[in-house]
Swiss-Prot record:
Superkingdom, natural source: Bacteria
Protein name: UvrABC system protein C
PANTHER family assigned: UVRABC SYSTEM PROTEIN C (PTHR30562:SF1), UVRC/OXIDOREDUCTASE (PTHR30562)
Principal location listed in the UniProt entry: cytoplasm
Keywords on record: Cytoplasm, DNA damage, DNA excision, DNA repair, Excision nuclease, SOS response
Species name: Streptococcus pneumoniae (strain JJA)
Protein encoded by which gene: uvrC
Amino acid sequence: MNNLIKSKLELLPTSPGCYIHKDKNGSIIYVGKAKNLRNRVRSYFRGSHDTKTEALVSEIVDFEFIVTESNIEALLLEINLIKENKPKYNIMLKDDKSYPFIKITNERYPRLIITRQVKKDGGLYFGPYPDVGAANEIKRLLDRIFPFRKCTNPPSKVCFYYHIGQCMAHTICKKDEAYFKSMAQEVSDFLKGQDNKIIDELKGKMAAAAQTMEFERAAEYRDLIQAIGTLRTKQRVMAKDLQNRDVFGYYVDKGWMCVQVFFVRQGKLIERDVNLFPYFNDPDEDFLTYVGQFYQEKSHLVPNEVLIPQDIDEEAVKALVDTKILKPQRGEKKQLVNLAIKNARVSLEQKFNLLEKSVEKTQGAIENLGRLLQIPTPVRIESFDNSNIMGTSPVSAMVVFVNGRPSKKDYRKYKIKTVVGPDDYASMREVIRRRYGRVQREALTPPDLIVIDGGQGQVNIAKQVIQEELGLDIPIAGLQKNDKHQTHELLFGDPLEVVDLSRNSQEFFLLQRIQDEVHRFAITFHRQLRSKNSFSSQLDGIDGLGPKRKQNLMRHFKSLTKIKEASVDEIVEVGVPRAVAEAVQTKLNPQETEILLQVAEERVDYQTEGNHNKP
């Protein structure tokens, strides 16, 4: 953190607004919103973060902020700033993603076409459809039933489609506008699932053709009826009211979010939109940003209603989308939201599983790594990382990979016991000594390779303990990160040297996963420990706030930061007496309390002076 950022952090207000992070080139790399600008922006430069947030913070050299009147105004401003500046760390939906629609043109002799552009031109649009293949399938069926004009430029003679009964041949057609409007209404009814009338008509025509011995024509009608039946089975009925609605659900895990949107048209689920992306703020806030961007895309028409999960701010969504917003509590609509959430969870799990479950790749990776380091295939790899902030609550963590996959039952956490202050080398010495001293004492199976998340100093410390103190023969490698906190170099050998390792190789990806996993495990443990210590210490000594009320506060607000941001009334709602709630706010926000007292004193002084001046 440079001096400019330090100075600006002192000037941040507690108001809602947007903040803009910039890199060394002055480019905007991230835009965020906050209910409390001071708390949110400061959080980036304090404490531990996961890998993706560390990568963002490492690039920040300056920031700006814009104060707004409300949280909703901040949300709207954030969406506009993202759209205008396209910061690389923000959620960005693909601009080129569009869905096909079936359109009946607003012409004297209308046409039935497929388009990806929705215009206010008087045409009738149906969709969107999952892909152009699905739209074409339905259009081909409609062409066989409804004889709309096919030609863009009218030919002087009747066309091929006229002869096969798929065009009215408007050059000789005597039908008026009312006829085509009626046909357009039939198409609309058909696409809404009201197709019984058409099926009955086709059955009648099939029977008539069979009676007159026109078996080929009867077979055509039979095929049409079967095609309609097939289409029915492909479009699952999700709601009985035949409404157009978008159903949102989301799920978060390991710093990633998946949002699923179900497009329900005329009561039928016709498509879903799936997006996975890393998030940096509270999940519900980034979800709102996603919704705002979603409806800025021209291809996403606003439906009759939008269904959202329970934990989302309904008023904020109403400010983003001009339609009916519902947070269903029960029944069919609640089931739709739950289904969207379930699918989001499954999609996110699949993403992580694909990274971990490729047996051939992981097996090949450990074999190649063994050949590269000239050691036996490292079937079992143990990796270590330390975590502390200015020496407070120092911890270390060990993760284990067996056959290239994480073996979570073997993970271990270590509280550093013998080190005072921020000494990474001494912490590494202690944890290596504790781990492999136990391996030696209890005759446990040693790993085939130890991987240290660190540079030459940490690796040499580990070597001293393993080889000189304990007399063990275990290969030790180090993984160094670059200035963007990304896996950069593999260190190995005696003396240590940088190993020539292709960044596109499976062994590199394996080491990257190991480094990310041990880092995640270490900072998660450190965050839990620090939060526990901080929570206990900051709320200790408040009269009337016992262990149970502390537990209720944490269960409701999830974090100490959110308790700090909460109003006295919000704390009272959790079951805390008002006097105790005021004491909590006073202790957690001493600066704000001081300012309020100062303002109150100045007001009293002013009133007193005014009274003295009265005659």
